[in-house]
Amino acid sequence: MSIFKMMLIYFAILWVVNAAQLLDIDPQGVIPGAYIVVMKDRVSSLEFSSHVRWLKRTHRRNLAKRAIPFTEGLSATWDIAGWQAYSGSFDEDTVQEILNHENVEFVEPNKEMQVASTIKQGNVTWGLSRISHKENSSHDYVSTYGEGENITFYGIDSGIDINQADFTGRARWGINLADHVDTDCNGHGTHTAGTVAGQKFGILKKASIVSIKILDCYGYGDITRYINGLNWAINDAKERGLLGKSVMNISLKTGRSRAVNEATVRAQEAGIFIAVAAGNQATSAEFYSPGSAPEVCTVGASTRNDTKAIFSNYGELVDLFAPREYIRSTLPHNLTGLMSGTSMATPHVCGVGGLIMATEGLAPEKVCDRLKELANPTIQNPGFNTTNKLLYNGSGA
């Protein structure tokens, strides 16, 4: 074989090795023509800036080549604790060139994200009492870890009604990445916030509350908005000196997404404890994000009888269970209401995590392990290869 042919084979192999992956994820909820692009870890900030300039030139050239009117392809860029990525809408030629770029790790389609709850009706309030007692027989709430003084709660959801009376003036509007309605017109975000930090219904009764709206009035958003929300929260916490003193509740889900998982983990590494919903599909949590990220605290849903809720996702990625059914909490316009789902379980973990972090001085990435140490092994029939640990706030009761 000639040296020339050997060189051709070598460069062909090298091209295959260096080409990024276009991840083949569950097609449900995919937004046509929209992508998330993640850079390799070794890429410097200067190289990332250079890549973005290259992307803009490439996008413009490929549109002109096909006589397509110019549209701004790039929609967002992110740097979350060194995790560099961007999103946008690009044609097939541009996507192929992105995949071939030496600094790109992978590309995946942008997808819808939505709330992870099931709305129910009833007249029961029991979650706070259950997580503050070892035995399932009490009806009061006990806490020896304080009330969340000096903790800030970031709610990434459908927004939060910051004027809700149960928030006692502690809530502020952060950013709206969903629409032009600067309030919670869905109710999901205000409900989860009430369990985390409401005066009557919550755990962090003295924490500051920040609303980050990424879902519309129907409870829908997408991965780009989600990562934009994470990025905004990290920057806000950094500017205000709140890293290491903040918690975040994510009662949302999309199909398994490497980009969502990586961004969520990096946000926690930056200094915010994160609790995420396992999901309500009665299957393994591994199929959904961010619940499939092993480094964050993934929460399954339990019933009043300390069994796994029938719809709760399960599996080795679930870290612990928390109350989920008929949870009464805050709604917009000073109303209250009952909801059920892993969306309602997760805020309990977020709240107790904030108490533990503040009182014991733990780093965010250590909080979930501590919660698992405190938890009670009381969940019956938790599912295949799933923990039986139920959230407990360590009150001694």
Swiss-Prot record:
Keywords: Glycoprotein, Hydrolase, Protease, Secreted, Serine protease, Signal, Virulence, Zymogen. The keyword Glycoprotein applies. InterPro entries: PCSK9_ProteinaseK-like, Peptidase_S8/S53_dom, Peptidase_S8/S53_dom_sf, Peptidase_S8_Ser-AS, Peptidase_S8_subtilisin-like, Peptidase_S8_subtilisin-rel, S8pro/Inhibitor_I9, S8pro/Inhibitor_I9_sf. The keyword Protease applies. It is an enzyme of class 3 (hydrolase). Its main location: secreted. GO terms for biological process: proteolysis. Glycans are attached at N123, N136, N150, N249, N305, N334, N385, N393. It comes from Trichophyton verrucosum (strain HKI 0517). Residues 20-116 form a propeptide. One of its GO terms (cellular component) is extracellular region. The active site is at D157, H188, S343. This is Subtilisin-like protease 12. It holds the Pfam family Peptidase_S8. Its EC number is 3.4.21.-. Residues 1-19 form the signal peptide. The lineage of its organism: Eukaryota, Fungi, Dikarya, Ascomycota, Pezizomycotina. Secreted subtilisin-like serine protease with keratinolytic activity that contributes to pathogenicity.
